[in-house]
Amino acid sequence: DYGCYNNRGRTPPYFNAIERELLGKKPARLTMNAELRLEPIHKTGFFFRVDTSNDGEYYLLEARDGVGWDSHIGGEGMLVYHIDKSQNIAGQIQASVRWDINKVNSYSLHECADLVEALPNAVNVKQVFFPGVGKVDKFATLTDPHFVDWEMRGVGVKFDDIKIEP
C-alpha cells in the first residue's frame, strides 16, 4: 500500500478537491444547469460544489489532466466526490461525527467521502473518470451512477455532454 502516492510510492498527486476544501479553499457553488468549463485543478485550484437538499451533504467536482504530479494517477477527466457531513446516520453514528473522529470512510455501507466512479463497477482507475474510457458523458438523477443524496433525492443539477477538450 503506497497510501496517497502513485508511481510505486514515489510520486504524490496534486491535492484533490476534498483536501483543498479541508485546507480552506472555497469551491464555486453550482445551483442550476449551465454550460461550464472545468480546468484541471492543478492549474487554477478551481472546483465545483453541488449541494443536496440535505444540509451538510454535497458533491465536489474537479478536473484532472494526467500531467505533472498527476502523470501517474492513471487517467484524466472529471472526478466526482459525494461528501456527507450531515446528520445522516452512517453506521450507528452521524456522518458529521465521523469527520470529527477521523472515521470518515470506516463504514463501507455509507462512506462519507466517496469517489463516485463513472463506471459503477470500476475495477481500474481509468474507469473512475468522466467521460473516461467508459465514455460516460452524463451525470444526473436517473443515470448510473445516480446524482442523488443518500435518500435518493435528485440534486437539481445535471451534467450532459461531459467531455475533455484539448
Task: Describe the residue ranges of each PLM region.
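Post-HExxH zinc-binding segment in Zn-dependent metallohydrolases
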Residues: 1-25
